[in-house]
Every structure is written in C-alpha cells, then in structure tokens.
Amino acid sequence: MTDKDLRKISSIVVDGVEQAPSRSMLRAVGFEDGDFKKPQIGIASTWSMVTPCNMHINKLAEDVNKGADDAGGKGIIYNVLTISDGISMGTEGMKYSLVSREVIADSVETVSGCMGHDGIITIGGCDKNMPGLLMGMARLNRPSIFIYGGTIQPGPNHTNIISVFEAVGGHAAGTVSDIELKNIEETAIPGPGSCGGMYTANTMASAIEAMGMSLPNSSAQDAISREKVEDCLSAGEAIMHLLEHDIKPVSYTHLRAPRDQRGSRMPSSA
C-alpha cells in the first residue's frame, strides 16, 4: 500500500499546485514538507475545566499526537465541547445535556469532515461526550479509535461523588453534621477523571471497548497513570494499522456491539 493509499482524503486537500494556499495555512500550525505526505489524523479532545472528568484531557491529547506522529502519521488536535450532568442535574441546565451529545457528534463530523482527516482519534470521559464522539466517528466511517480519559482516584475512606449525595441525604435526616458534610464535599473528588464507580462513564468505556472501538484495557485505567499515557501513545500505531487495512467503525461494530455489550460470547467465526 502506498502513502497515497493511506491518505485518500487528505491528499485532496493538500496535493498539487492548486492546493498551495491550503498548505500555506497548515505550515502556520506546524506542518513541514514531509508532513504533507503523511496521513492526517484528527485528534478530537474534549478538554475543559467545566468538569474534573475532562480537565486532564489536553495532556492526553498531546500524548496521542506524539503517538500519531511517531507512527508515521500527522496528528492534528482540535477541541469539541463537553458539559457535566453531575454538576447541572436538578437544574434548568439539564435541558442541554442530551442535546450536547448531538452537538459533539456534529462537531467531530464537521471538523474532521471539513479538514479531510484520514483517520480520527477521539478522547472523552463524561456521560454525553463519549457516545457523542462515537456517533461522530460512525457518521464519517473513517478509521477511528476512541480513548477513554480514565477514572478518578478515590477520596479519603474510598469516597466518591455518590458519597457526597449520600451525605446530603444524611444531613437532611440529621445523621450528618454541617462539618462532616463540608469535609466530604471538599475531599471526595480529589482530581481529574470520571466518577469513580460503574456509573455512566465507566460503563460506557467498558461498552466501547467491547465494541472494539478502543484499545484493550483502555476502560480500566486511572486517569492519571502510566498505563493511560501508554494507551494514548499506542493509539498512533493502532490508527495506522486501521488505515493500512482500511478498517472502519461500521465494518466491525455492527457485528460486535449487540452481543458484546450484553456480555455474550461472540461466535468463533465473528
């Protein structure tokens, strides 16, 4: 397979005399001569400071970018939005929650579709951005990988977000004091990562891995860990493999998803 075969889409954007203006703009964001002969890998980051689930994803995106470049591609990072159900629930803000999933899917489809990315790697770690990213990749149906941002570390005495909700209930019942409630509030969520339990994000991560859209063990790694860094770096080699063999989401998720997400064993011929 030639280099041109690996960049069937981006070659339309950057090859030939007529595309000199496009190349000129890409040079401003760091492209050099050799980069125009590499497959372009769109890296969709859901980094945001609106929620701890995604506050570290900018660093993961940089690791993914390095992995893509080292594997012979050219990584291009871009951002898509994210919101937090955990923060907005019970308020008018939840009216935007489900809609955000569609906006995220639209964003991936719009950016990578517009810019001519040959492959796509998305990074997410919250209730709506994870399915939204998958929807965007499926719509474009180009070689794609999802990377889970990873789970958060527990607070003292194995506390997590549920501990805070329970403390609110205990406070209402008179079994948790003001001081105890404040202490749990301040310590239960110590840093980056998705809610520490089999809630929506970790469940989605497991389902996505079962579908074959993320690398093995991606769903079981801490947000801040050497394993998660290696997961990000390995994605570059994996996306190049998908490009070389023209493996796309729709070609395998429709076979794996219904059975694997239910925990059923796949037939040996699958």
Language model: regions and residue ranges:
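Gly-rich Lys/Arg/Thr-decorated short loops/hinges at beta-loop-alpha junctions or inter-strand turns
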Residues: 3-10, 41-48, 82-94, 185-190, ...
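Active-site cavity-forming subdomains of large catalytic enzyme subunits
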Residues: 97-252
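A short N-terminal beta->alpha junction/helix N-cap motif
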Residues: 9-13, 31, 48-56, 195, ...
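Long, structured ligand/cofactor-binding scaffold of large enzymes
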Residues: 34-143
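Conserved small/polar residues in nucleotide/adenosyl-binding loops
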Residues: 253-260
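N-terminal amphipathic/basic leader segments beginning at the initiator methionine
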Residues: 1-35
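Hydrophobic alpha-helical segments, chiefly the membrane-spanning helices
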Residues: 264-270
